[in-house]
Amino acid sequence: GRTLNKLEVIYDEIESLGAPQPAILPLQLSSASPRDYELLVDTLDKQFGRLDGILHNAGILGERTELANYPTDVWDDVMAVNLRAPFVLTQELLPLLAKSQHASVVFASSGVGRESRERWGAYSVSKIAIEAVSQLFAKENVHPNIRYNCINPGATRTAMRAKAYPNEDPKTLPTPDAIMPAYLYLMGDDSLHMNGQSIDAQD
């Protein structure tokens, strides 16, 4: 979730399961400074000592319009959240990922990240680029214990989907919970053999 209240609900759910105590470390991805990333890494290092994985799931849609008329400020915002933030976060967190026995970095992709479509603008460009980022991290990897993959959630019942397809009946779409097994697969040890791949959550 983007709000502290939503994060606190997840925090409480994790604690209720008897899992290790989590931490809430908010970071505004659209405007984070190098110092913000440094503080995040330092805090994670002090509290946990290592990082077993990253799921880069934050994203914004931008505008559904032609590139010829695409607002540059919206373009910059989409690129900051969808492309720059996951790249910088991964780069900064590499030392903590390297301390894990098996670390998994998962980037959120999209159908328009495989093939561009008209009027998807910055969102499509950012997702095509994030697929390349994942592949390059995988190919250039100097830490054999870290793997990098992409996942395309497909048509899912989310606010972003409703914004992109306002005339679509959301009840016809699977919920995020329904596709969660695919995410858990990529984050867990069952996918140790996968690196530099891109999968569809609904296949």
Q: Where on the chain are the PLM-derived regions?
A:
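C-terminal helical subdomain
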Residues: 143-146, 150, 158, 167-203
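Substrate-binding pocket helix/loop in short-chain dehydrogenase/reductase
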Residues: 40, 65-67, 74-76
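Rossmann-fold cofactor-recognition segment
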Residues: 14-33
